[in-house]
Amino acid sequence: MDRKHLANAIRALSMDGVQKANSGHPGAPMGMADIAEVLWRGHLNHNPSNPEWADRDRFVLSNGHGSMLIYSLLHLSGYELSIDDLKNFRQLHSKTPGHPEYGYAPGIETTTGPLGQGITNAVGMAMAEKALAAQFNKEGHDIVDHFTYVFMGDGCLMEGISHEACSLAGTLGLGKLIAFWDDNGISIDGHVEGWFSDDTPKRFEAYGWHVIPAVDGHNAEAINAAIEAAKADPRPTLICTKTIIGFGSPNKSGSHDCHGAPLGAEEIAATRKELGWEHGPFEIPQEVYAEWSAKEAGAAKEAAWNEKFAAYEAAYPELAAEFKRRVNGELPAQWEEKANQIIADLQANPANIASRKASQNALEAFGKMLPEFMGGSADLAPSNLTMWSGSKSLEASDFSGNYIHYGVREFGMTAIMNGIALHGGFVPYGATFLMFMEYARNAMRMAALMKVQNIQVYTHDSIGLGEDGPTHQPVEQIASLRLTPNMSTWRPCDQVESAVAWKLAIERKDGPSALIFSRQNLAQQERTAEQVADIAKGGYILKDSDGKPELILIATGSEVELAVKAAEQLTAEGKKVRVVSMPATDAFDKQDAAYRESVLPSDVTARIAIEAGITDFWYKYVGFDGRIIGMTTFGESAPADQLFEMFGFTVENVVNTAKELLA
């Protein structure tokens, strides 16, 4: 059957889906249909009957607005995505949302739409493939051996994150990464030469990529030859495909008119005629389905891999068991009891250290049990303290390590980590100063949206970092992280809470965790075994009064010590004061009503929250009658102790505020 005819099935489904939804983007799917046909029918190793097959090739549609392209491909190839699912494009509770979303349609490897993040996730997937291969493959046993393919448009390349990711991909020599640039010269505003005149091939050559320029994106032979050349090269490859947006539309192709709106009934009829597609809306002939189906070939490919894995298992039983455990995302045997023992030992051996140092100690203790750790930092390892004795850096020539030097690329780092998590086999953690999570915010939001594990270590968490001043002092960042749905945010007060936060982040497979640590030393608090167990609840009674409290002090992180000292003074003066440490408000909010009431009794309305961050967040815990000692402005450049005094983080101020409140 004519290959153009098979590609036209994508074009027909794409324009029909967008038309029925009365919204969407037909241009990119119609322009990239020929490339997709060659890649998916000739090269992509996948099994529609098992989208989770560990050694499948990964395909990422970075220009996610062209989602009807991937939905059409999944449907035609034989995934569980019906023609009715395609008719439900962009409708409530459908498997085909406006942008591809991980966890909806089978075969969607990542959520894309925010441009540039798909290619960055793909870099993470390719890094995971290369690292897993280095850790598990043995001579004659290549059980990890797959490619990561990406489609991306001009918008992805204009986004700064594409520079961060593609630069690192070149440095690390990710030869199994193959990207197709949909060079159609059109964006929403029109022809891109007015705002995007980069020499893209030279840009990627400068990154150390293999670049194949000027490929006719509508010529199957040229596309196929480019893919063959890409697969044979040890460098990551950019295939520059010249395409016509909206290919086949007589009056709208080649213009921004077909980028982000339905073609309209008349134009669709004219396009069908132009393409020689004689079938009605959403109608695909059986013989076209037969040519497209990847079920038989995919099952055979997976069966062949299963045979390879059985031979590997016979030769290396322990490694094979470990591979299965890691790919399934399971924690090692006895994880729970060993981790709890580590935490108990910390409580029994007090240390007044910075929580960033406590974090490093937790990495040291837990890292020995977790070969799946893949750490990193955005060029701040000596400050974030993210390296431990078992850390080994990844290098282009040796990927057997477990630590990535991301360079100063916070956004790239975080989105790469999403790709590593999506690929499987690793528990990724990365780090920067809390202030610079701002650069990475959208990638953390994507982790929360996709429900993937992404552990961020954010150090230097307040005005407590001192002299570097307000450019580096976070104020509103902690609150903004807490406000993000499905984000777990921890601000521990000492080494014990820090270790608990790490343990829970490692166990949390259905969303990201932000672990927030101090630069300055923090005093360790006394606790019973029951109190240690209650840390996991996110908020607990750390110090209590004799009898019912008349005042509750709620604090996090570096301010817990302050709350305890103020409570001691108030208690000495005859006041009944309870101190609540609340390292994770999201965890506390998930506790049942009885527990929350036991910690914060509703009839005790005299409450003060103390945190060196924005004040507004805390009203939900102290009420309108309560008080908040926090930040209402940006910080200043000065030694930390002077700043804490200036902004009211003193025992004297807490005591005076309490007396005013109780009066």
UniProtKB/Swiss-Prot annotation:
Catalyzes the transfer of a two-carbon ketol group from a ketose donor to an aldose acceptor, via a covalent intermediate with the cofactor thiamine pyrophosphate. One of its GO terms (biological process) is pentose-phosphate shunt. This is Transketolase 2. Substrate binds at residues 25, 259, 356, 383, 460, 468, 519. It catalyses: D-sedoheptulose 7-phosphate + D-glyceraldehyde 3-phosphate = aldehydo-D-ribose 5-phosphate + D-xylulose 5-phosphate. The active site is at 410 (proton donor). It comes from the Bacteria. Keywords: Calcium, Magnesium, Metal-binding, Thiamine pyrophosphate, Transferase. The keyword Protein biosynthesis does not apply. Thiamine diphosphate binds at residues 65, 113-115, 155, 184, 259, 436. The gene is tkt2. Binds 1 Mg(2+) ion per subunit. Can also utilize other divalent metal cations, such as Ca(2+), Mn(2+) and Co(2+). Its EC number is 2.2.1.1. GO terms for cellular component: cytosol. The record marks 25, 259 as: Important for catalytic activity. It holds the Pfam family Transketolase_C_1. Homodimer. GO terms for molecular function: metal ion binding; transketolase activity. Gene3D superfamilies: 3.40.50.920, 3.40.50.970. Mg(2+) binds at residues 154, 184, 186. Belongs to the transketolase family. Its cofactor is Mg(2+); Ca(2+); Mn(2+); Co(2+). PROSITE patterns: TRANSKETOLASE_1, TRANSKETOLASE_2.
